[in-house]
Amino acid sequence: MSGSYPFIDIAALDSIREGFAKGDAQLVLTHDLSAVLWVNGPGAKLFGFDRVEDMIGGGLDLPIATRRQIASSNSNAEGETRTVSVRLGGGLRSDLTRFSVSHITLPDGVSGLLLTADGKDAEAEDIISGLSDDSTHIALIDANSRVIAASPRFAALDISSTTLEDLVIEAADATDRIVKRRIRAGKHSVPGAIARLTDTPPMHLLCIIGDAPVATLEAPAALQGEAEEILEEILPEPVESANTEDASTDQQKPRSFVFEQDAPPARFIWKVGPDGTFSEISPDLAATIGPNAADVVGRRFADVANVFGFDPDGSIAALLDKRDTWSGKRLMWPVEGTDLRVPVELAALPVYSRDREFTGFRGFGLVRPAEAEKDPEEIGLVLAGGIPQARKPVSEPVETATPVEDDDVLALGEEVANDDSPVATLPKPPLDIAPTPGRRESDKVISLLNACAEEKVAADQARMLKEREREERPEGGLTKTERNAFREIADRLRKQGLANSRAETETVAISDEPVIDSSQPVEKTEVKASLIDEVTADEASLPSSGMAYGDETALLANLPVPVIIHSGDKIHYVNQALLDLTGYESLDDIRGAGGVDVLFNSESDDGETRQGMVLRRANGSEEPVDAHLNAISWREGRALMLSLMPVAAAPVSVEAVAAPAEAPVAIDKDDEKQALADHVEELKTILDTATDGVVLIDPEGRIRSMNHSASALFGYERDETEGKFFSMLFAIESQRAAMDYLHGLSGNGVLSVLNDGREVIGREAKGGFIPLFMTIGKLPHTRGFCAVLRDITQWKRTEEELTNARKEAERASSQKTEFLARISHEIRTPLNAIIGFSELMADEKFGSIGNDRYRDYLRDINRSGNHVLALVNDLLDISKIEAGALDMQFEAVSLNDAIAEAIALMQPQANRERVIIRSSFQSNLPDIVADTRSIKQVALNLLSNAVRFTAPGGQVIVSTSYEMNGDVVMRVRDTGIGMTKSEVEQALKPFRQVNALERRKAETAKDWRSEGTGLGLPLTKAMVEANRAQFAIDSTPGHGTVVEIAFPPTRVLAD
């Protein structure tokens, strides 16, 4: 399919794929609406095209108002969607289609406009309609690898269910949802791609590029029989030749592979599954060593190695079992049709799925034909079934030839079998254009179905057969230009109106030539010699270097349909039918008169825009025409082929003929009024469907009308509000604001530009009140206004609930803080007494205790009291931080000095625990903006935790640094027991202690009361964040913990 982008790449984009799977009509346009970049089948059908390739790359003929409506969506921001209503169709009947217009970014970064129309009741066959052709096959695949819908010739590819399952799995693992590779189809592999469109339920789009087997392309019985009847009528007597049978045999015999030993090294890609079965090999290997020798897809590597005699020691098979990356493995591969074998170097990489499941190996290979050596087993001869034929030189003359008539008959049969349109609707042309497969386009034979033409064809047989070996025709017999031309003829001649409107013209044109009776033998038909001479002169006039170009124009020149080939405003070619219709003598006359612009005029003399396309003749007269546009290949580039068909005139009644000249004008005006009334009725229906209330206001502030939603919103009937002031719809406190808003818009002031709406309170007919959001706009012609009112009751209720929830949370936090403050005062007094008396008794100032056990009890009482006091202080601090009431005095703080003081305080405890504290401070470290007391508290907490959870003999390292990005960083590293990720998360929650504490207790037999309260790390983190710094912790069980506190550059007082 044509277009600047692969079709499946666009279909897999996130903004397109789900709508594509639903059957929505979609097309992508350039921002200036000049070209169609992409379209799906329903989108092409919506605009009157049967195939998407006929629409992609061409322009879109839209009315000026529609273009302006769509182009207005260019101002939308990325991701925003705007709904526009577009009237499609022409004449007296047209449909109003609603499109969603949004911006889309294509794979190469180009931005375009995406138009989407809802696909109502779309079937699976509708989704893939218009996508397939002779060489493109489409299918929809579900999650179970079943075919939901497929193009007519997809089944002929013979793709197995296992292959489809592999494609579905690969598409699920692909990050961009697309997989492109060669796919096993029967005994061959063809290029294809699969895209995952949706996830729930999964749906996949599969595209295959390749021709289906010939046996599956048979025509229906009806067409086959009709084609055979036509062949029997036009087939001339066969030309007897002694070598006919030999030539036919040579044509049917397949081409043998020829090994080129002097070819350069070739690279190829290969893939095997988890069981060692080849699943893919690129065609480069088959092109070098032969298709039979490279046909190993679906076979295990061990079996192939056993048959071909390579990898005797099983080293490569062992590497495939290890699932490791390997390279540099060399083996000798037999060459098809020879007694040689060539060295092949292989390398492979293991492939895993998204779930880390092993899916096989992907690798590349290097074939070196120049290093071929003798194969003692001569396996290559077995692969080809014997010694291959030697290659014949291109310049070898052809002594015998197959009759051209046989080729023409076969070509015509193939065209009839492959024609998509019904043969019965096509009138028989006076000339039979019969392309011959395998022949150059410049060597077509125009069979005139008479004896004289047969002699002319027989005389040119030798020349055509010699040039047949130089250049082959495309498969199918016709070029793309010819195929488009024939398809255009079929589409146009199928219409019944053409036969009625042109019956008389064709009769006159054909009457000058003898009528050929199909019941008589071809040999008895007489043709004027001048016609044969004209054909001979036309063939002789074509230059040898441009035979293909002359042949295209010769074909188009004989079409009965007016055709224009152009690119933009430049006309490349027009045929004789168009010159006859317009009255111009030549193409140069059309170019001199103004080109395309002078041929088509969309406005009448009075300035009114017409609905259809009108062709203007050279004498100034005009004729309405139907047009069909196709994108084709022309010369060495791309162009547009515009085919025209005059619109059949409607039958005129006797009353219309007898009526005066003014009657048609009156009828047109009545139709125009009716169409305008219908349009107004549609707009009213749209307004009544909207959920927002719409009120129309006159310049004096009185209500003109309102839609159904506004009537239901306020509880008024329409008649009750007409002519009354707009302020009656609002509560007293909002009436002034509403009227000020209205007057501000009428004055063309700032409000007319910055129109952001108002929140007002509406008043119902029964006296109730409604919170509303109102937006007013000016009407262009009547100087009135349009007010759009939206009920925001639910929004207000949600806002009130959120406000109440916030107040409740603040009240609970305040109560908690107040409770902790009271508790702290109540607990501190007895705690201070307990701690003081325990210290006094331990000093034995009033006498000796006399027992060491009592002294231990006093130390325990003192330590427990201090522990409870620290707990109360921590609770009070963390509650203040959560409430935002912590008293912070920000000033310049020397981080090195603060940490040094904390180390000095913790040094005695570290000595008792036999833990070494080391420091590494950066010199000239800039000061930071922080609270001095909280920074010292943070350092003490971190050092206390590090010493507490480090075994004797361990180390605690405290360091500071000034980073390149301007951060001042403090790090505390220990060699303690460490924590897992889950334990770190638990330790950062208040009142939570990790399970490692119990292990620590069992290992060191420490008192559990010295293990902390679970507030150390949460309080430290809260204080760090209160100082506008960042807190990070990294810990590994058995290796220790690293706590990092980073002060950003905004908190650093650098010089």
Curated annotation (Swiss-Prot):
Reactions it catalyzes: ATP + protein L-histidine = ADP + protein N-phospho-L-histidine
Keywords: ATP-binding, Cell cycle, Cell division, Cytoplasm, Kinase, Nucleotide-binding, Phosphoprotein, Transferase
Span list, region Important for polar localization: 1-626
Gene Ontology molecular function, alphabetical: ATP binding; histidine phosphotransfer kinase activity; phosphorelay sensor kinase activity
Residue ranges constituting the PAS domain according to the UniProt record: 679-750
EC code(s) of this entry: 2.7.13.3
GO BP of this protein: cell division; regulation of DNA-templated transcription
Transmembrane segments: none
Modified positions (Phosphohistidine) in chain numbering: H825
Keyword Transmembrane part of the UniProt annotation: no
Cellular localization per UniProt: Cytoplasm
Species the sequence originates in: Brucella anthropi (strain ATCC 49188 / DSM 6882 / CCUG 24695 / JCM 21032 / LMG 3331 / NBRC 15819 / NCTC 12168 / Alc 37) (Ochrobactrum anthropi)
Enzyme class: transferase
Principal place of residence: cytoplasm
Source taxonomy: Bacteria, Pseudomonadati, Pseudomonadota, Alphaproteobacteria, Hyphomicrobiales
NCBIfam families: histid_kinase_PdhS (NF041593), sensory_box (TIGR00229)
Name of the protein in its database record: Cell-division control histidine kinase PdhS
